A protein has these predicted regions:
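Short Lys/Arg-enriched helix C-cap and helix-to-coil transition segments
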Residues: 76-89
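Short acidic, hydrophobic short linear motifs in intrinsically disordered regions
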Residues: 45-50
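Short alpha-helical "packing" element that flanks the helix-turn-helix/winged-helix DNA-binding module
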Residues: 30-37
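Short helix-capping/hinge SLiMs at alpha-helix to coil transitions
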Residues: 39-43
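Short, Lys/Arg-enriched N-terminal segment that forms or immediately precedes the first helix
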Residues: 2, 6-24
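DNA major-groove recognition helices of helix-turn-helix
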Residues: 63-77
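Short, basic interhelical loop/turn and adjoining N-cap
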Residues: 56-62
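Phospho-regulated, low-complexity intrinsically disordered regions of nuclear gene-regulatory
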Residues: 87-137
Length: 137
């Protein structure tokens, strides 16, 4: 795992994805829908506002915990200790993506976090056949 980005190896992601799909009593379809949406996004970059709209939620606050749940499940499965923010909240999303605040004038006035899917997670999704590999021209 890269200390700078918390990106894991392709094999670790594959193991974590299998764990997610085998886990009982969770909505596998929802979490795969989230990962597929992120994978298919331009530059594999999304905001939580975009994810919320895709999932049919009113705003980003409903999408945040679902996105974080994927990371928390990965962390639990692989025994990862996660960095925390200033409030002491674990940054589970960092196992899925790196984030930046981007001036997002086209979508929202002000600044919004943009999440870039980790390349190794993208590769793991492809290798497991969970997404169709993107074609490059």
């Amino acid at each position: 795992m890269s200390k700078k980005t918390n990106e894991m190896s392709v094999n670790e992601y594959k193991s974590a994805l299998r764990y997610l799909l085998d886990k009982k009593k969770i909505n596998h379809e929802l979490y795969l829908k989230i990962l597929t949406f992120h994978y298919r996004a331009a530059n594999q970059a999304i905001t939580m506002t975009e994810l919320a709209a895709h999932l049919g939620y009113g705003d980003y606050s409903a999408a945040n915990p679902r996105y974080g749940f994927i990371g928390s499940l990965f962390a639990s499965h692989l025994g990862r200790d996660m960095p925390t923010d200033r409030r002491g909240n674990s940054r589970y999303f960092s196992l899925i993506a790196r984030s930046e605040i981007e001036d997002n004038e086209q979508k929202v006035v002000g600044k919004e976090f943009v999440f870039y899917l980790h390349q190794n997670l993208s590769t793991a999704l492809e290798e497991l056949g969970l997404v169709q590999q993107k074609l490059t021209v």
